[in-house]
């Protein structure tokens, strides 16, 4: 093949994929398989000792999943990646090599409610502590870091409020403390935002959302830039010190820029078992082939709908970084020049009850707890996705009682506006009685 650098639209179709060597099939096959035959005993030993690359068992690596891993790593500009069963599993997998009981990580207050709940409660069972900080207060971010801090975590475009994190500023603070910056790029996708170019060291995805794009497959992904020095500080012994699971092998010394990726496959997936199913990887590969086309339409529709909502008398605010009036508009141009994605929130002047009435009155929008679908989705976070949070946490996450979250799809934008118009009228009519 000609030695050249391909564009994003080409890579989203071709990266990682090759014609099947056995059949010549051009589309990546679904290897619905668990185990793989060894050539001989020496081959088996080499695989188990991590001396040779290959397939052992699909909990660690599967041929279909491997194509997806290479494609997402390529699109993000990373050195390597490993897939997980869900986005929540990806968050566990990103932190697992870095943390020990008693360690902490600093996370943005502007996160998906499920992440806040996972960090606050489930991670306590591992002995991990989270410290939530508003990343707009950089002094507070610095102050939250101590000798037991092991990572800094944020979302590129926050769900649900559409807030855009100043990634360069967060990376500078993290690196000054000898810590990696982990960025959840689910809402933005690698088409809209390039976290590695702004200082991120690891990227997480819920591939369930825009990467798959059609709400057909659960999945997650952790992508490693491959440049963080895991041996420099002594803070990451799982990567820098001898591994008892592999007869004293040191992952960073042995695998260099792929240390985190190899650890993720050989230890995290092996022992926690959060692997992605081949069928789900196949569905996600199909979705990624049209990622740029879909995201352009998603963003155009979102801007049109948000602009209309901004002028509606029943609406108190619209939080969408793509609007010129947004306080994050300049940041959107810096980090997401092709568009600010299609997840945003707006507030209803009539509060919580009006929000409930609105989601029950829509006809074209689907009322459900997902995002990144080709279909337009609506939800009232305070009564659903962010219900477990305290009122204070809801407010910090831009998910207060009056807030509605939209995930704008690829339908005709005028049809979406018409549906919101009739639903808003229905919610106001009841309020006026």
Predicted regions located by residue number:
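PLP-dependent enzyme catalytic core of the Aspartate aminotransferase-like
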Residues: 120-121, 129, 147, 294, ...
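Conserved N-terminal alpha-helix of the aminotransferase class I/II PLP-enzyme fold
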Residues: 40-92, 114-122
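N-terminal "arm"/small-domain region of PLP-dependent enzymes with the aminotransferase-like
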Residues: 2-62, 70-71
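Structural preference for beta-strand elements that scaffold enzyme active sites
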Residues: 151, 180, 202, 317, ...
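Conserved PLP-enzyme active-site core in the AAT-like
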Residues: 2, 12-14, 18-21, 81-311
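Conserved small-domain helix->loop->beta segment predominantly found in fold-type I
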Residues: 272-275, 280-281, 286, 290, ...
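Glycine-centered tight turns that cap/initiate beta-strands
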Residues: 77, 148, 314-317, 364, ...
């Amino acid at each position: 093949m000609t030695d050249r650098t391909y564009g994003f639209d080409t890579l989203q179709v071709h990266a990682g994929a090759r014609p099947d060597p056995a059949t010549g099939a051009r589309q990546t096959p679904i290897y619905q398989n668990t185990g793989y035959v060894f050539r001989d005993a020496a081959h088996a030993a080499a695989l188990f000792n991590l001396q040779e690359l290959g397939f052992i068992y699909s909990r660690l690596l599967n041929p279909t999943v491997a194509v997806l891993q290479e494609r997402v790593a390529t699109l993000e500009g990373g050195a390597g990646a490993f897939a997980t069963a869900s986005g929540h599993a990806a968050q566990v997998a990103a932190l697992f090599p870095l943390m020990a009981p008693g360690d902490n990580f600093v996370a943005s207050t502007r996160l998906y409610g499920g992440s806040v709940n996972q960090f606050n409660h489930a991670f306590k069972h591992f002995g991990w502590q989270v410290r939530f900080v508003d990343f707009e207060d950089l002094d507070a971010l610095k102050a939250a870091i101590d000798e037991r801090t092991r990572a800094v975590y944020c979302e590129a475009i926050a769900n649900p409020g559409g807030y855009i994190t100043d990634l360069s500023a967060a990376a500078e603070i993290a690196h000054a403390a000898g810590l990696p910056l982990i960025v959840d790029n689910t809402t933005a996708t690698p088409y809209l935002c390039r976290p590695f170019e702004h200082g991120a060291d690891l990227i997480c995805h819920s591939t369930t959302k825009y990467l798959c794009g059609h709400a057909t497959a659960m999945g997650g992904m952790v992508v490693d830039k491959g440049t963080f020095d895991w041996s420099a500080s002594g803070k990451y012994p799982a990567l820098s010190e001898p591994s008892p699971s592999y007869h004293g092998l040191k992952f960073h010394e042995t695998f260099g820029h792929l240390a985190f990726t190899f650890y993720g496959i050989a230890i995290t997936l092996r022992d926690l078992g959060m692997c992605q199913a081949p069928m789900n990887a196949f569905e996600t590969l199909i979705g990624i082939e049209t990622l740029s086309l879909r995201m352009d339409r998603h963003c155009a529709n979102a801007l049109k709908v948000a602009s209309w909502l901004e002028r509606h008398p029943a609406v108190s605010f619209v939080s969408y970084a793509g609007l010129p009036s947004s306080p994050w508009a300049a940041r959107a141009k810096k980090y997401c020049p092709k568009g600010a994605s299609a997840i945003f929130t707006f507030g209803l002047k009539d509060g919580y009850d009006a929000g409930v009435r609105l989601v029950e009155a829509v006809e074209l929008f689907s009322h459900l707890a997902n995002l990144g679908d080709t279909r337009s989705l609506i939800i009232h976070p305070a009564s659903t996705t962010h219900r477990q949070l305290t009122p204070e946490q809801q407010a910090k996450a831009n998910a207060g009682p009056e807030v509605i979250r939209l995930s704008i799809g690829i339908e005709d934008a005028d049809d979406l506006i018409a549906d919101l118009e009739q639903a808003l009228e229905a919610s106001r009519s009841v309020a006026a009685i």
